């Protein structure tokens, strides 16, 4: 591997050539920048590579940044930009201008028109950087999008469609997972993952790599079981019933603990397969009680468990532990136990970022983790030189016997420094430690600002003011990372910013990040750590005797470079353990990643396909083979097909009726028979869908297949997660847990594919039958307009006077005989016949509603009025009705009026058939009218 020195020498020469173009770039007019961008794009289309055009592109971007921001990039910033384009991590000290550095590779790679993602650790930084750098990109003619958690899908799609998109790491990963859950390809928001630049790369790619991104859905809750597991954990004694590994923070039941578990839950064997769920609950309860601390890993607020980012101290809103650990913590803290979630989609940051064609990153400290960057991400860490020499003084640690002694000395030093006016930044490792220090500072009447998981809203504002005279800022870990602490006027003369770290962090780079807040751009400064034997790191990595000797110091301390080196070595050991843990997570996730890629790729194929017959055909073969296996029995050590049983299951249901006889199953290999059955399945399936519109079929097929994929992939994730949580027990049987996991996870994946195929074949069969049935019903109740009736009458030659069952059936019988060989015409005629017969039924129904024993005569009067003719009620005849009706039809062009007349005519014909009754009723009506005029509105008939 090429050394940093040689690379920096090479990149330095390139940077010099970029700077040499400055006079030429100064001649550009503002409108020339867009023309330059178009010219660069054309060069790439003509076959030039990014490296071929890098020097001129960076020179143009440098001039654009100078004009817009008033900042002329230093040589070291150009070197950083070259490192980023090469797909590596640029380690740049605090204050060296990482935001400006990112402009150059972003612009260069945006010219490919494939998209560039600039990733930050929070939305404040994304918004800030997109607003600042967006002005430069606007001059260059490059579009910029800002992604955020509050955006709609349409807004996200718009943001990702831009040349450059600013986004947070979490939102980027969740968008990827959500994109692979959509039911329509057009609903995706991201393009193909091309190139990303990750700000604070160590935080994103290492610190957060241990926590996978998970999208969860609700499932049934088990409140009583969680409470029982919590009560059991409370009944255990730390040394008698448990083995606790402080170094790795793992908790295990020892032999006595296992015995207690069996007694508590009335079990014979905790490790029996049927007790997997109980075992899982117990392990979560043990973690919650003995490995997780309130104020360190989580905090409780408003009856809710909120996760704390271990490396920034920020609350991770919207995040929760999976696999029941969140519920175990809720039981421990006696808050409401939420519904347990099931994982719908998951990915680790490690595997997500490896999906990009090229990744790069910037950070202040990453060299200590270079091995991990190379092994996992295939990226080097190259340290860029500072623009000015670092003159900050890094003092040896002050080591105390107790936390109280350390904090008393801290307060003394803060008081002394504060009296001189120099600003102070106090860094802590947890919210708990932050609150403890705050109490000491308040007791000493020192005014200070605090940033931790419980108070982070004003984070950037507080950090920005931390360099003012007399400022005291208390910050959890690397809160405010990404915001420079600029020294106020006169602070340099006071010795610059003092950084006091309370307790060493798990990783050296986090300590280095804290130190690096002081001494930016050649400013003076000082850093010092106050550590004690009560610190987590010391408890885990020092012997009890050593801790006891330090306790004897009382309030005194040791300031020794040798002991500082010993602490650094302990950190190295812990870094190695954490790397192993992350590598272990990755080893297991790699199996899931391969399976995820297969599922997501197949899902995309299904979303984009216009014809899914090949997919269905393969699934039918799988389903057919499984049916054969299911209906086979073991005879003399061999599985023999139960032919009769198999035939009964498939005949007329999955394959055409009488397609197979029992003899057809003789002397055939199972796979050959499965292919034959699958072909018959497809034959029946195609016959059933032949009359359904093609777009309806493809939509239905796509939905059924995607639903099956999502249903069984979710189940697979759940089972694989539970498998992984207990796989470590295999080591007690002298087995390799990872090898066993690979074997079992692969078997689970194959079973999942079989379940998907079975589900799709069964559901397609059921749904198609329902669609055909619904289609038939739909045709029966088809909505018909007046225009439809006119067209049918015209096409069939029926007269309006022929709207009765006999005439309609006679005419359509003639037409069906005539067109008996035309399948499409016959189908149309059958629909038309049903429409006309349905019309007759409707007319009869309306006639029954109109005609009643009490108002027949008034109905006739109203209907005659409807026909607009004077007819003597007493002598009305069928012939008169037809004659008047036909006369009226010739005069009317309005379909609605024609409809009214058809109904009126039909009603009159029915009434005439009962003429004798009507005449008798007329006499009765006249008698009634003498007594009282009939004014009942219900007797007035409104036709239509």
Curated annotation (Swiss-Prot):
Q: What GO MF annotations does this protein's record show?
A: ATP binding; protein-exporting ATPase activity
Where do the record's region annotations for Disordered lie?
920-944
Q: Which GO terms describe its cellular component?
A: cell envelope Sec protein transport complex; cytosol; plasma membrane
Keywords, comma-separated and alphabetical: ATP-binding, Cell membrane, Cytoplasm, Membrane, Nucleotide-binding, Protein transport, Translocase, Translocation, Transport
Q: What biological process terms from GO does the record include?
A: intracellular protein transmembrane transport; protein import; protein targeting; protein transport by the Sec complex
| UniProt superkingdom | Bacteria
Q: Where in the cell is it found?
A: Cell membrane; Cytoplasm
CDD domains noted in UniProt: DEXDc_SecA, SF2_C_secA
Q: What top-tier enzyme class does this entry carry?
A: translocase
Residues holding ATP: 77, 95-99, 484
Q: How does it sit in the membrane?
A: Peripheral membrane protein
> Where is this chain compositionally biased, Basic and acidic residues type?
933-944
Known catalytic reactions: ATP + H2O + cellular proteinSide 1 = ADP + phosphate + cellular proteinSide 2
EC number(s) given by UniProt: 7.4.2.8
Tell me its family. Answer: Belongs to the SecA family.
Q: What does this protein do?
A: Part of the Sec protein translocase complex. Interacts with the SecYEG preprotein conducting channel. Has a central role in coupling the hydrolysis of ATP to the transfer of proteins into and across the cell membrane, serving as an ATP-driven molecular motor driving the stepwise translocation of polypeptide chains across the membrane.
Describe its assembly: Monomer and homodimer. Part of the essential Sec protein translocation apparatus which comprises SecA, SecYEG and auxiliary proteins SecDF. Other proteins may also be involved.
Protein name, please? Protein translocase subunit SecA
Protein source organism: Mycoplasma capricolum subsp. capricolum (strain California kid / ATCC 27343 / NCTC 10154)
């Amino acid at each position: 591997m090429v050394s940093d020195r040689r690379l920096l020498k090479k990149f330095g020469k390139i940077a010099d050539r970029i700077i040499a173009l400055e006079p030429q770039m100064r001649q550009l007019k503002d409108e020339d920048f867009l023309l330059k961008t178009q010219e660069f794009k054309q060069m790439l289309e003509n076959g030039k590579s990014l490296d071929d055009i890098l020097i001129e592109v960076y020179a143009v971007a440098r001039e654009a940044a100078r004009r817009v921001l008033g900042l002329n990039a230093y040589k070291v910033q150009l070197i950083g930009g070259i490192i980023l384009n090469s797909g590596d991590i640029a380690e740049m000290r605090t204050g060296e201008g990482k935001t400006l550095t990112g402009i150059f590779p972003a612009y260069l790679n945006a010219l490919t028109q494939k998209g560039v993602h600039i990733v930050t650790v929070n939305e404040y930084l994304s918004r800030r950087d997109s607003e600042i750098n967006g002005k430069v990109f606007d001059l260059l003619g490059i579009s910029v999008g800002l992604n955020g958690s509050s955006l709609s899908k349409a807004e996200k799609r718009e943001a990702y469609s831009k040349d450059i998109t600013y986004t947070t790491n979490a939102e980027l990963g969740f968008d990827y997972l959500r994109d692979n859950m959509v039911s329509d390809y057009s609903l995706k928001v991201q393009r193909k993952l091309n190139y990303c630049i990750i700000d604070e790369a160590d935080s994103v790619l290492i610190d957060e790599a241990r926590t996978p991104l998970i999208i969860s859905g609700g499932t049934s809750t088990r409140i009583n079981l969680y409470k029982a597991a919590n009560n059991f954990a409370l009944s255990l004694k730390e040394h008698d019933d448990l083995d606790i590994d402080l170094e790795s923070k793992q908790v295990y039941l020892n032999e006595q603990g296992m015995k207690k578990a069996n007694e508590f839950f009335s079990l014979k064997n905790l490790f029996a397969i049927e007790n997997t769920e109980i075992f899982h609950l117990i392990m979560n309860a043990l973690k919650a009680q003995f490995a997780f601390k309130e104020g360190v890993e989580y905090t409780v607020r408003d009856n809710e468990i909120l996760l704390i980012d271990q490396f920034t101290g920020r609350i991770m809103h919207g995040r929760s532990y999976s696999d029941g650990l969140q519920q175990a913590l809720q039981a421990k803290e006696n808050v409401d136990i939420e519904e347990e979630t099931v994982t719908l989609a998951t990915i680790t940051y490690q595997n997500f970022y490896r999906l990009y064609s090229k990744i790069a990153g910037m950070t202040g400290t990453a060299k200590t983790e270079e091995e991990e960057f190379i092994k996992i991400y295939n990226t080097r860490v190259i340290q860029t030189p500072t623009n000015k020499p670092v003159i900050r003084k890094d003092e040896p640690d002050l080591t105390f016997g107790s936390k109280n002694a350390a904090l008393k000395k801290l307060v003394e030093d803060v008081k002394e420094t504060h009296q001189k006016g120099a600003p102070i930044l106090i860094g802590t490792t947890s919210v708990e430690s932050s609150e403890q220090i705050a109490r000491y500072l308040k007791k000493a009447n020192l005014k200070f600002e605090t940033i931790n998981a419980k108070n982070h809203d004003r984070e950037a504002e507080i950090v920005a003011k931390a360099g003012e005279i007399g400022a005291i800022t208390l910050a959890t870990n690397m809160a405010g990372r990404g915001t420079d602490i600029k020294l106020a006027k006169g602070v340099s003369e006071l010795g610059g910013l003092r950084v006091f770290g309370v307790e060493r962090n798990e990783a050296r780079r986090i300590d280095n990040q804290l130190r690096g807040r002081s001494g930016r751009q050649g400013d003076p400064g000082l850093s010092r750590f106050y550590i004690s034997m009560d610190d987590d790191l010391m408890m885990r990595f020092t012997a009890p005797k050593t801790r006891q000797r330090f306790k004897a110091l009382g309030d005194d301390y040791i300031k020794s470079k040798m002991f500082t080196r010993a602490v650094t070595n302990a950190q190295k050991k812990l870094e190695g353990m954490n790397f192993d843990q992350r590598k272990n997570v990755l080893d297991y996730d790699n199996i899931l990643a391969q399976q995820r890629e297969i599922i997501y790729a197949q899902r995309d194929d299904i979303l984009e396909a216009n014809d899914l017959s090949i997919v269905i055909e393969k699934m039918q073969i799988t389903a057919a083979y499984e049916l054969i296996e299911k209906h086979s029995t073991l005879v003399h050590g061999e599985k023999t097909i139960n032919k009769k049983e198999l035939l009964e299951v498939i005949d007329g249901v999955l394959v055409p009726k009488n397609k197979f006889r029992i003899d057809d199953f003789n002397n055939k290999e199972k796979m050959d028979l499965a292919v034959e059955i699958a072909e018959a399945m497809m034959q029946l399936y195609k016959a059933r869908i032949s009359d359904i519109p093609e777009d309806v079929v493809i939509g239905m097929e796509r939905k059924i297949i995607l639903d099956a994929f999502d249903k069984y992939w979710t189940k697979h994730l759940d089972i694989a997660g539970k498998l992984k949580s207990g796989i470590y027990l295999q080591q007690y049987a002298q087995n390799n847990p990872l090898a066993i996991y690979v074997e079992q996870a692969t078997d689970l994946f194959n079973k999942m594919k079989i379940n998907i195929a079975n589900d799709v074949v069964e559901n397609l069969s059921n749904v198609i039958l329902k669609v055909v049935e619904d289609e038939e019903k739909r045709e029966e109740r088809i909505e018909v307009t007046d225009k439809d009736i006119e067209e049918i009458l015209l096409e069939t030659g029926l007269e309006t006077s022929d709207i009765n069952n006999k005439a309609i059936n006679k005419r359509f019988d003639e037409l069906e005989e005539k067109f008996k060989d035309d399948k499409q015409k016959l189908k149309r005629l059958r629909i038309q016949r049903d429409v006309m017969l349905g019309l007759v039924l409707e007319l009869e129904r309306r006639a029954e509603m109109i005609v009643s024993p009490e108002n027949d005569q008034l109905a006739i009067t109203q209907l005659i009025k409807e026909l607009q003719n004077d007819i003597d009620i007493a002598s009305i005849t069928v012939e008169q009705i037809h004659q008047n009706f036909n006369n009226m039809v010739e005069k009317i062009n309005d379909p609605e009026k024609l409809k009214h007349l058809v109904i009126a005519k039909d009603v009159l014909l029915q009434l005439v058939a009962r003429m004798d009754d009507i005449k008798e009723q007329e006499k009765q009506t006249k008698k009634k009218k003498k007594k009282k005029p009939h004014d009942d509105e219900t007797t007035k008939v409104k036709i239509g």
